[in-house]
Amino acid sequence: MIDSAWKSWYRARHDQRCIASGDAFEDYATALLARLHSDYLNPAPMGKHGDGGCDGLADNGSILYACYGQRATTGVDQKTKDKLESDFARGLACWNGFSTWRFVTNALFGPLPTKSVLALRQQHASGTQRPITIEIWQVDDLWWKAADKLTPAQLDEVIPGVPHAENVELADLVELILSLEDVDGDGPDHIESIRPVPSTKMDFNNLPETTRAEFNAGRLLSARIDKWFSEQADPALRDEKAQRFRVIYQEARQATRDVREIVRRVYGALGGQDFDLSTKRANAVYAVTAYFFDSCDIFEEPPADNAGGEVRHVTTY
């Protein structure tokens, strides 16, 4: 499931998509509707009738959608009114089976289109010759009534951005990340086999307190990670990923001397740059990074005679 932080991220991207004008907004809206309805049909424009004022039919033809991405910069209210009336008239003439008409738009609704909607509702009220429910879906409606109803996979098809391994050579660890996200915190493996905190190595690499806290939280899942690697068909997978982590760390060190930036680059390679918008995803990324930190695969090992981290191998300046 997408947690509240990721839902906020998707909502922000939705609002950005809805700023687009013309076809860009209409394509976005129909992409959502096509996933909202399993029987959604969007006829291609043909001949003099075009698409018949139809941007989608759903629920066995009982719902007809018309989408309008605002194009006008002057006379906006009049043009929205004209578009609404034109699409409704064309839909009424071409499609005789619908009982609900939805006008999906990112245009502001001023007095003129509002009056048109009221007039059409009176003309097609219950008890008239052709009763039709007339609905206006604006940006908020499109979110709550369509986007918010989709599964995470469907939503990611329309608005790509669900966290993933940014580095292609770590992509097969996505399954591990997802398995760690499912940990509820109550299972026995959540408290067993916790690795001792290697404070000397953390001191030697001058890890900031925030990173230490992240690593310490991640270590609670180390037994899960051991178990996951032991269950993989390729016994060399763990060593292969350890080598890749080492390369990513070394590349980060070549780009910056700030240990916080280095850690962030390692996190991003594993979970994507926006990994921390999801609390569970962030904890899983911390866990895997701490796992390879503790097993000496990333960052530098202090000399054998280093007692307390007086030497600072990586600076934060």
Where are these regions (language model features)?
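Catalytic centers of nucleases
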Residues: E26-T30, A34-A89
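Acidic-basic catalytic patches of nuclease active cores, encompassing PD-(D/E)XK
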Residues: I2-A44
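C-terminal accessory/interaction regions of large nucleic acid-associated machines
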Residues: V247-A255, E261-R265
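Acidic metal-coordinating catalytic centers involved in nucleic-acid phosphodiester chemistry
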Residues: A89-E251
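Charge-dense, extended regions
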Residues: R260-Y317
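Short, compositionally biased low-complexity segments
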Residues: M1-W6, P235-D239, V259
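Broad structural signal for hydrophobic residues in well-ordered alpha-helices, predominantly aliphatic
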Residues: L33, H124, V263-V266
